[in-house]
């Protein structure tokens, strides 16, 4: 059971929900430059499994690492933290 707790958990924004049962999540992280101490922003996109197609474009979601579900999917949707506001 402790193995499951070692899996990576990220919070990011949904940038694509066009695929069936799959969303693309943009995760932004900050790292400090060793020499200059400036914070540098890094971003990466993850394909994420969304079983019920519940996440929509612009939502803030929490994703967790899991076994490989396809050639590119390695994460699954845990929860929708904040829903996007549609104007």
From Swiss-Prot:
GO terms for biological process: translation. One of its GO terms (molecular function) is structural constituent of ribosome. InterPro entries: NA-bd_OB-fold (IPR012340), Ribosomal_uS17 (IPR000266), Ribosomal_uS17_bact/chlr (IPR019984), Ribosomal_uS17_CS (IPR019979). Keywords: Ribonucleoprotein, Ribosomal protein, RNA-binding, rRNA-binding. PROSITE patterns: RIBOSOMAL_S17. The keyword Repeat does not apply. The keyword Chloroplast does not apply. Part of the 30S ribosomal subunit. NCBIfam families: PRK05610.1, uS17_bact. This is Small ribosomal subunit protein uS17. The lineage of its organism: Bacteria, Bacillati, Bacillota, Bacilli, Bacillales.
């Amino acid at each position: 059971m402790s193995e499951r707790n070692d899996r990576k958990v990220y919070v990011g924004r949904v940038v694509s929900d066009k695929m069936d049962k799959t969303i693309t999540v943009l995760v932004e992280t900050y790292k400090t430059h060793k020499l200059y101490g400036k914070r540098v922003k890094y971003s990466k996109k993850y394909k994420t499994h969304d079983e019920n197609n519940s996440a929509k474009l612009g939502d803030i979601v929490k994703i967790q690492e899991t076994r490989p579900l396809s050639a590119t999917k390695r994460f699954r949707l845990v929860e929708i933290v904040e829903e996007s506001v549609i104007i």
